[in-house]
């Protein structure tokens, strides 16, 4: 009888707060469960350098390569901590899937840039490494994002009803899982990104812990309406987005400077919730259950905004109710994609990205 296999997934999202590593167990292409997690926060200096690369500037090529190496050393450290916590050796792991750190996402030009020195990561970890997952989908005419709907479908689909899965990272994205049709999904718009940027600019804090600052503010209806008028929200899916559209300087074009900082933050929370509600109402009108993952689930103000928007129409749940910690989901997805690569299984959600066909995502690097 063939033994089961262990994989590690490493993910650092658009919130740029750090790197998550998750250990999963597979039986060939069959998911058996997630078994461990490690997290390494980004030092402030690293985060600032990554944010600086979001905009064009001098010496970009050199800076991006140096940051790729720095990130890969941090990723290797995170993987080592995970192995240590599980009493495992690198030789126990079949493959490691690494997403890298997105610094540019331009599907209209058929490219998306995730920083990671994958050969260095393979060398540092002594584990076969799979990465650069988005490029293959882009080559087939897709958006390169979101990639997680195929993983959500493999784990969370129900044969009796349509489910929605909401990931709230820097960008929010939904996966729609019909019982009798392929999964699809798309980016709904900003998740935590604008709230985090506002916190950094006005409180010098990386995020609004427990929604404490937003809870002190009031929604500004006129500002909310102006934000919701962005043409991205009227575009049909498949679609994806990032900081290129929804950066702090975009928000500031709608402000006169006299707004209370707490009120703006409160409005940004409702903005995220409203765009999610509008997307689900349009694309998954028959969904009655929505399972939530990502960092946004820890913000009670945002969760209350979602509950108010959806009312009794859709029940909101954590993915923990489906046996996967909401903080582990994205990293687990890239471990699963590494397993798909090893087993030559197409892992791309082409109905979500708009690619012409299902693809085996990623490129592999031996140590």
From Swiss-Prot:
State the reactions this protein catalyses.
Answer: 1,6-anhydro-N-acetyl-beta-muramate + ATP + H2O = N-acetyl-D-muramate 6-phosphate + ADP + H(+)
According to its UniProt record, in which pathway does this protein act? Amino-sugar metabolism; 1,6-anhydro-N-acetylmuramate degradation; Cell wall biogenesis; peptidoglycan recycling
Protein EC: 2.7.1.170
State where ATP binds. 13-20
- Keywords, in A-Z order: ATP-binding, Carbohydrate metabolism, Kinase, Nucleotide-binding, Transferase
Protein known as: Anhydro-N-acetylmuramic acid kinase
Q: Which organism was this protein described from?
A: Neisseria meningitidis serogroup A / serotype 4A (strain DSM 15465 / Z2491)
GO molecular function terms here? ATP binding; kinase activity; phosphotransferase activity, alcohol group as acceptor
Which family is this sequence assigned to? Belongs to the anhydro-N-acetylmuramic acid kinase family.
Q: Which HAMAP family match?
A: AnhMurNAc_kinase
